[in-house]
Structures are given as structure tokens and as C-alpha cells.
């Protein structure tokens, strides 16, 4: 907990916000210490040995933003949950909005964690529900392709150059 607090206080602005598909902390004068830190501590209590691997990163200097592509392995402390429901690796993209201060350093003003819908489905309803979502998305993709082909056949839609 002390390390988490130290890292957040070193690299995040006091008014930093946090946005995750399951929860968020809006920007306020003390949102880092009275919100973001609590989210991180809650996740630390819920999950042990969380491993995050960064696969790629990009700094957009013009927009003061960092993009991270990562995988996160989560294992619950609760044995029943760990055995039957929750021990998985999830892919995500993390967006960090930065602000450069007078000291010349960049600080995180906003963290946004982005997961695909099937990753979130597996989090909420584990046990293969992510496969159902993937199949539904593939089915909808095929319906769209058929619809476009039908309208192109009728001459309603044409491909633009």
C-alpha cells in the first residue's frame, strides 16, 4: 500500500482522474489521494500477484498522451474464486493523459483503461461467456457483409474510389 501511494504521489497529479469499464474517479482537487489510490488498493486486496506486461508503448508528444498495449494476469486471493471463476489474462490498452508542469516533468492527469467487450464479459460472467460475445460479434459482422453485398447488387451502394 505504501509503494502504491508513493508511486501515485510521484507520477500522478493531485487532481488525476481514473476511468475503467467497471468504475471511475472523476477529477477533483484531491481525487488522486481520495479516489484513485483507493481503487488501486481495493484491486490489490482483491487480486494477488497481478502481473502486467507492456507489449508496446507510444508517446504522442503533440497531445501529451501515452498509449500502452498490455496484458494483465489477475488471480484472486479468494481460493473458490481463483479455482472456479477468476484466474485469467486480459488484454487492454491504457491511455495516460499527461500534463507538463513548471519543473519540466510530465505527470498523469488521467488514466483510462480500455478492455474489449469480450474481456469485460469474461470478468462479469466467467466460464466461456467471452466466446459467446465473440461469436455474436462475428455473426453481426457476417450480417453486415451480406447487407452491403445485397445493396451493392441492387446498385444502392457503390464502392467509392
Identify the residue ranges that each predicted region occupies.
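Short acidic-aromatic low-complexity motifs
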Residues: 1-15
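Eukaryotic intrinsically disordered and solvent-exposed regulatory patches
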Residues: 3-5, 53-55, 78-84
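Short, cysteine-centered beta-strand-loop-beta hairpins and adjacent loop/turn segments enriched
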Residues: 45-49, 73-88, 117-126
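Exposed beta-sheet edge and beta->alpha loop/turn motif
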Residues: 67-105
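Terminal "cap-and-tail" regions of soluble proteins that handle hydrophobic small molecules
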Residues: 97-161
Amino acid at each position: 500500500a505504501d509503494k502504491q501511494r508513493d508511486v501515485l504521489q510521484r507520477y500522478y497529479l493531485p487532481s488525476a482522474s481514473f476511468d475503467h469499464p467497471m468504475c471511475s474517479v472523476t477529477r477533483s482537487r484531491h481525487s488522486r489521494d481520495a479516489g484513485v489510490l483507493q481503487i488501486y488498493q481495493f484491486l490489490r486486496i482483491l487480486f494477488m500477484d497481478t502481473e502486467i506486461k507492456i507489449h508496446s508503448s507510444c508517446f504522442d508528444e503533440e497531445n501529451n498522451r501515452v498509449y500502452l498495449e498490455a496484458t494483465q494476469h489477475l488471480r484472486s486471493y479468494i481460493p473458490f474464486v481463483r479455482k472456479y471463476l477468476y484466474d485469467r489474462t486480459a488484454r487492454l490498452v491504457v491511455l495516460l493523459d499527461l500534463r507538463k508542469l513548471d519543473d519540466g516533468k510530465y505527470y498523469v492527469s488521467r488514466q483510462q483503461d480500455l478492455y474489449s467487450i469480450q474481456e469485460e464479459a469474461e470478468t462479469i460472467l466467467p466460464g466461456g461467456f467471452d466466446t459467446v460475445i465473440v461469436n455474436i460479434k462475428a455473426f453481426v459482422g457476417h450480417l453486415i457483409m451480406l447487407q452491403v453485398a445485397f445493396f451493392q447488387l441492387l446498385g444502392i451502394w457503390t464502392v467509392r474510389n
